[in-house]
Amino acid sequence: MRTSTTSIRRARPADADPLADLFDETWREAYRGIIPGVALERMISQRSSQWWLGATQRSRPLVVVEQESSIVGYAVYGPARGRILQAPGEIDELYIRPAYQGLGLGRRLFRAVSNDLADHGLARVGVWSLEGNERACAFYTGLGGIAIGQAIDRMAGTVLPKVGFRFS
């Protein structure tokens, strides 16, 4: 019998290439048909390995989900970047590779990040999701998130409504 080893840890500079690949795959899966094609390609190209190398060295926490020494997910989080979510903590990004979705890894990553925020006095957490990303909205609702606000992003001349979720 073979068991699978899964860990959640801080990202390291050596993770830059796998994070760039993961970002490319997860964003294409999540946003194809939601974000206009040219804008999506531009965003993906901006998140190169070099960008991720810098992200591993910034003060905002970046953690990865590693399974059998492969990075299959990541999250970026920290103090809230705005006030609309009415929460002191915010998860900026949380993505799991499509082949690993539905296995509980996203839930586990969310809990780990939420616990880390709470350990730093940021017990109430907010997160934004594009309204058209039904899978993400269902994920956050399933975790107990309450939709508390709406806002818009603009990308390549397209208005992208987003919904804010809060967790207590």
Which functions belong to the PLM regions below?
Residues 2, 161-168:
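Terminal substrate-recognition subdomain of acyl/acetyltransferases
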Residues 2-6, 10-16, 20-99, 107-116, ...:
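Acetyl-CoA-dependent GNAT
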Residues 127-136, 154-159:
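Conserved beta-strand-loop-alpha-helix junction that forms the acyl-donor binding cleft
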